[in-house]
Structures are given as structure tokens and as C-alpha cells.
Amino acid sequence: STYIDTIPAQVSADGRLHAHFIQAGTTTGRFSSSNPNLQNIPIKSERGKNIRRAFIAPEGCMLVAFDYSQIELRVAALMSQDPYFIQVFKDGKDIHSAVAMKVFGVKEGEVTHDMRRRAKVINFGILYGMGVNALRQNLGTDRKEAQLFHDNYFAQFPTIASYLESIQNFAKEHGYTETLFGRKRYFPGIRSSVPFIRAMAERMAINAPIQGTATADIIKIGMKRAVDDLDKAGILGDVNLVLQVHDELVYEVKKEHVGEAIKIIENAMKHAIPSEFLANIEPVPLEVSVGEGANWGELKE
């Protein structure tokens, strides 16, 4: 009802929604959206898909969505320089299955759906500074097994362990963290005398460089590069960015320019990180999935 009841009343006379987007609307540096908040429309539920089907392209146009694939884990690989993670992404393999192989001690063909699901929880949990108790709850297991997964993860990926520790130590010493591009986020609570406030700040600090780099800095640089490249190609007026949802960019494209626009925007997003920030480190490929269709709820790759 949040969307079904309120969105129709917010449609302007031109048949469009003119939502507000705030460039620094979150502490991580990500965009936020309001009036209405189009970033919170569900995608996995059938109702969410039906709501998205109501967002249609004008006559003569298509909606084309570009979505970064596993961007936070790719950035984690880049910033930690973990050799296993980097190789998995270079080989084009699934990172959650690859981590499951290590954590559960199985071969590639032996990874079950449940193992991959658990590895995904562990991957994001560790990167978000999740402790053993939180892992236990999210995995639906007991503390002993959660502790085993936690310890095994750090034993298998010592480079990631040392990277996360260095981030936390830096934040404790300086009171802030930095993204790959040097954007700072301050954590006044990290020196608090109140234990739970200090612990919360430490958890947030662990993930801040990764999340800030991935879902804020890179997406914005990709957006700017796409605009510049579309302008150079002379089709900027026929390719309009209409929505940004975290890792996803949605464009309204004149049908005759869809193919060209996809190549330009996909390339801009894949090469969003300027080369000077990759000097002396092993790069990690950024991958983008593309879907197009007449409405936002039915986009085909």
C-alpha cells in the first residue's frame, strides 16, 4: 500500500514521477530518494514486480537497466588485494561458491545450494563487521558452528582479515576511514567511553571504505563517464538517466539508439575507476548486467 496508494497521487501532469534524489543522502555517500522513494520498491516479490511494471517507457523508447554485479565483493577484493578473490573474479566464477569451497572444504562440483547461501551470508557478514552472534542468527545455527565458520573464513583468507583489521586500527587512531578515492567518513563514536557505541562505530568503520567506494563513488563516476561518452557520441539527448537504485542505473533510450547506448554506458561503468587509482595494485574487473524492455518490471538481458 506504501506504493500502490501513494505513487499514483504523485504523478505529475506530464505523466511522470519527479522524485527527489540527494547526492549525499546517506552516511556512506550513496544517493537517497524521496517524494516518492523509488529506491525501496521491492524487486524479488511478485507484488514488487507488478509495481515496477507500472513504470513504462514512452512511445518510441525502451527502458535499459545497468546493474553492477557483486560490486561490493569486487571492491573488497581490490582494496584488500586478496589473491584468491581476485583470481575468482578474473576467471569469471561465482564468488559465493568459491568461498563455500574454502570454508566447507569441498570441491567445485560439490558445493550445494545451502553451502552457497551460507557462504553468501558469511561473505557479507564479515565485510559488514558482523560478529559471531550476528552470524549465528543470520545463518540459523548455534554459536559453536558460527564461531567455526568465522574462524575458518579468516584462516582461509588472511589477506582480507589483515585488511579489515588495518581499517579498524586506522579508524581508531584517526577517527575516520577513506574510500579508494580518498573520501573520508568520520566516526566520532569510535572513541566513545560507552562500549556499545564504540563497538557499533567499529563495525560501521570496517565496511565504510568498501561500501562507500562501491555503492557511492564508483556508481557516481560511472554515471558521469556515461554522460560524457554519450555526449561525445552525439546521442545524449536521446538517452536519459531516469533512475538510480543503489547498484543499478535505469535509462530511457530512443529505440534506434539502444544498441549504441548499451555499449557506451556498459563500457563507462566497467571502466569507472580511473587508472591512477589502480597504480601498483592488481586490478579487479567490474562486471555489469544489462536488461532492456518496455517497462521496468520486465527487462530482458
Where are these regions (language model features)?
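Conserved catalytic core of nucleotide polymerization and phosphodiester-bond processing enzymes
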Residues: 1-301
